[in-house]
Amino acid sequence: MKSYQNEFIKFAVEKRVLRFGDFTLKSGRMSPYFFNSGLFNSGASLARLGRFYAQAISGSGLAFEVLFGPAYKGIPLVTATAIALMEKYGRDIGYAFNRKEVKDHGEGGKVVGTPLKGARVLIVDDVISAGTSVREAATLIHAAGATLAGVAISLDRQEQGQGKQSAVQEVEAQYGIPVVSIACLDHLIRHLEEKPEMKEHLDKMQAYKKQYGVERVFNP
């Protein structure tokens, strides 16, 4: 685990985005942790989150020309990431996002921001649960004459969905692209291993991974 990944986990705990305990997920599955990126809800926290995304993206080596944020959660994320890539790495990357409703006046269309045609596009989102927003974004990107280069998310839960694959693995297999995450389940476990006072939570996380976990293919 890289130092920035450990810092991200500490940051997420501090903001109560990441909590350890007993939680029931939408799927009905019992989970020993809960991750709610909506609590990154201030200017300072969003700016810092953008820097973590920029670090993960830059470290991945992915080639792209445009960032894309799926509405609605992806819009502040893609904006913060574009700013961080400029401020931290000197990369002035265009960004775009989609509307949920089509406008018939003004600039019109479903995509707002940098034109996508001919570009390699990296989607920036919070997590991939069912993969719905990523698939919708991929359809828009391809319809605009662009190429999907990959997806960047904050946390990869590394757990099976309905089948043996995780939602992340399903997206990677369907589109033949890598999904980059700031952190993943393995990193959460390593973080807890360094905290003896969190042993009860560590045991639950390890048991959860044993029951539902999948290995990451792209895990820098």
Curated annotation (Swiss-Prot):
Cross-referenced Pfam families: Pribosyltran
What protein name applies here?
Answer: Orotate phosphoribosyltransferase
GO MF annotation: an example? orotate phosphoribosyltransferase activity
User: Which proteins does it associate with, and in what oligomeric form?
Assistant: Homodimer.
List the catalytic activities from the record: orotidine 5'-phosphate + diphosphate = orotate + 5-phospho-alpha-D-ribose 1-diphosphate
Name the residues that bind 5-phospho-alpha-D-ribose 1-diphosphate.
26, 72-73, 99-100, 103, 105, 125-133
Gene3D superfamilies per the UniProt record, alphabetical: 3.40.50.2020
Q: Which PROSITE patterns match?
A: PUR_PYR_PR_TRANSFER
Quote the InterPro entries the UniProt record gives: OPRT, Or_phspho_trans_dom, PRibTrfase_dom, PRTase-like
UniProt pathway: Pyrimidine metabolism; UMP biosynthesis via de novo pathway; UMP from orotate: step 1/2
Q: What class of enzyme is it?
A: transferase
Amino acids binding orotate = 34-35, 129, 157
Q: Name the gene.
A: pyrE
Q: Which cofactor does it need?
A: Mg(2+)
Q: Which GO terms describe its cellular component?
A: cytoplasm
Q: Which family does it belong to?
A: Belongs to the purine/pyrimidine phosphoribosyltransferase family. PyrE subfamily.
From the UniProt record, give one GO term of the biological process aspect: 'de novo' pyrimidine nucleobase biosynthetic process
Q: What EC number is given for this enzyme?
A: 2.4.2.10
Tell me, what does this protein do in biology?
Catalyzes the transfer of a ribosyl phosphate group from 5-phosphoribose 1-diphosphate to orotate, leading to the formation of orotidine monophosphate (OMP).
Alphabetized UniProt keyword annotations? Glycosyltransferase, Magnesium, Pyrimidine biosynthesis, Transferase
